């Protein structure tokens, strides 16, 4: 029987029931719904709605139901209940009879689902923070292993300046640390308890909402009942945090896909995160990374979905808000598996140092060093930049790197150049001169790793 059936004389159509029911999605809130119901039993007992004995019986039945269902969603879905709240109430009534009908006194599904969803976001958010920390640790460990491995750094996907692989790793550590901070902040704002807000105007019973919030491990109760049941900012913020983090994961995946390509050959991926071709026996495809990149789009789609759903809803609750869960659940599932997979990829990644070094030595990546050398000799940087551009054009025509040009050839472009130019054009010099906080010099990267390991 529907929780709202008394108002209606006609039967619900089978098509409408299929369209309206949310149990196939919101069954994932079962644990939170039971936990919230246990707290609500205590709350209504405290104001005399039920006796202490009745409260004890209700709580025992709810805990029994929690144990019976366990982690098997089919136990819930197969019942055909309208939603998770209906399922719990129906099962409770089956266990304790009419006493089960008292539990919903003073409570609406509006504040009930808002509470369930926040509890779920808090639990899953904590698990996501742990996953982000694991990924961060893998990146730091990889940076430490490859702290001095040289590779080209890119702008516009053109070789720009040499960097170390450790420096590349730490760039993504910074990104994922921002993701950690962003999610942590979002969870702080979600840490408010809507229970006791009723349908929209507040419960009619003198519930101590501070005690209720504390019982459910919320930081505090919400402060406006109308906002409490209308708010889905926590869903939006979790999807937003996921979208930004997936952007970072996708960028990292794209870098690694390129580094792993035959054209670059800077890294090798482990067999356990790659697959082959059904036709071409030689193939070893970076499928894990490509799927991370691909799943980013579906996470973005869910963020846009909830934003679009919420953008024009009048206060307070509207049935549109039932659409908040499917996208959220998919976002959390996608983000979680991508974080796990990225950590696994990094744990087995090997840097091919020789090809990476050779690539860093090509493409005139030391041109900036020559410009800096001329500046040190007294030439204004803009003029030095122009001169070195001409040197690069000449070197290309000679099919030689800058460091292989003779002193006479170099002096044809700038009389300031002398024999001491050549030590400045080595890869080692290029790296060591970036000895500034945040730079790619090996000692700076090593120092940064040490700090990250302590954090």
UniProtKB/Swiss-Prot annotation:
Top-rank EC class of the record's enzyme: lyase
Alphabetical keyword list: Amino-acid biosynthesis, Arginine biosynthesis, Cytoplasm, Lyase
Catalysis: reaction(s): 2-(N(omega)-L-arginino)succinate = fumarate + L-arginine
Domain of life of the organism encoding this protein: Bacteria
GO BP of this protein: arginine biosynthetic process via ornithine; L-arginine biosynthetic process
Cell compartments where the protein resides: Cytoplasm
Coiled-coil features, chain-numbered ranges: none
InterPro entries: Arg_succ_lyase_C (IPR029419), Argininosuccinate_lyase (IPR009049), Fumarase/histidase_N (IPR024083), Fumarate_lyase_CS (IPR020557), Fumarate_lyase_fam (IPR000362), Fumarate_lyase_N (IPR022761), L-Aspartase-like (IPR008948)
Recorded metabolic or biological pathway in which this protein acts: Amino-acid biosynthesis; L-arginine biosynthesis; L-arginine from L-ornithine and carbamoyl phosphate: step 3/3
A molecular function GO annotation: argininosuccinate lyase activity
GO CC annotations on file: cytosol
Enzyme Commission number(s) of this protein: 4.3.2.1
UniProt cross-references to HAMAP family, sorted A to Z: Arg_succ_lyase
NCBIfam families: argH, PRK12308.1
Family the entry assigns: Belongs to the lyase 1 family. Argininosuccinate lyase subfamily.
The protein's name: Argininosuccinate lyase
Gene that produces this protein: argH
């Amino acid at each position: 029987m529907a929780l709202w059936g008394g108002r209606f004389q006609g039967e619900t159509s089978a098509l409408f029931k299929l369209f309206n029911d949310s149990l196939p999605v919101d069954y994932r809130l079962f644990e939170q719904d039971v936990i919230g119901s246990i707290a609500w039993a205590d709350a209504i007992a405290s104001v005399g709605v039920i006796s202490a004995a009745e409260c004890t019986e209700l709580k025992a039945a709810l805990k029994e139901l929690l144990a019976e269902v366990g982690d098997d969603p089919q136990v819930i879905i197969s019942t055909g209940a309208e939603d998770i709240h209906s399922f719990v109430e129906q099962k409770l009534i089956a266990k304790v009879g009419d006493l089960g009908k008292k539990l919903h006194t003073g409570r609406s599904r509006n504040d009930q689902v808002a509470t369930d969803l926040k509890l779920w976001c808090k639990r899953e958010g904590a698990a996501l923070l742990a996953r982000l920390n694991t990924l961060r640790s893998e990146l730091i460990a990889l940076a430490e292993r490859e702290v001095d491995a040289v590779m080209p750094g890119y702008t516009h996907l053109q070789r720009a300046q040499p960097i170390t692989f450790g420096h590349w790793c730490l760039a993504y550590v910074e990104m994922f640390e921002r993701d950690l901070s962003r999610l942590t902040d979002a969870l702080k704002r979600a840490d408010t308890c809507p229970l006791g807000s009723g349908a929209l105007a507040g419960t009619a019973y003198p519930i101590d909402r501070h005690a209720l919030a504390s019982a459910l491990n919320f930081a505090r109760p919400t402060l406006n009942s109308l906002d409490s049941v209308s708010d889905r900012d926590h869903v939006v913020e979790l999807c937003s945090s996921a979208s930004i983090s997936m952007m970072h994961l996708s960028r990292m995946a794209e870098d690694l896909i390129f580094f792993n390509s035959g054209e670059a050959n800077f890294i090798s991926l482990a067999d356990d995160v790659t697959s082959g071709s059904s036709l071409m026996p030689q193939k070893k495809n970076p499928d894990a990374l490509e799927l991370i990149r691909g799943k980013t789009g579906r996470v973005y789609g869910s963020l846009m979905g909830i934003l679009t759903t919420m953008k024009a809803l009048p206060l307070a609750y509207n049935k549109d808000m039932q659409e908040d869960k499917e996208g959220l659940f998919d976002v959390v599932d996608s983000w979680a598996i991508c974080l796990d997979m990225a950590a696994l990829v990094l744990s087995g990644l090997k840097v091919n140092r020789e090809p990476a070094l050779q690539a860093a030595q090509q493409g005139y990546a030391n041109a900036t060093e020559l410009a800096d050398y001329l500046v040190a000799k007294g030439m204004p940087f803009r003029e030095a930049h122009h001169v070195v551009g001409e040197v690069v054009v000449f070197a290309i025509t000679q099919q030689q790197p800058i460091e292989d040009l003779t002193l006479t050839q170099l002096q044809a472009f700038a009389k300031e150049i002398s024999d001491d130019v050549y030590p400045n054009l080595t890869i080692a010099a290029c790296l060591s001169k970036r000895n500034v906080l945040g730079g790619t010099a090996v000692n700076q990267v090593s120092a940064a790793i040490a700090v990250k390991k302590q954090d």
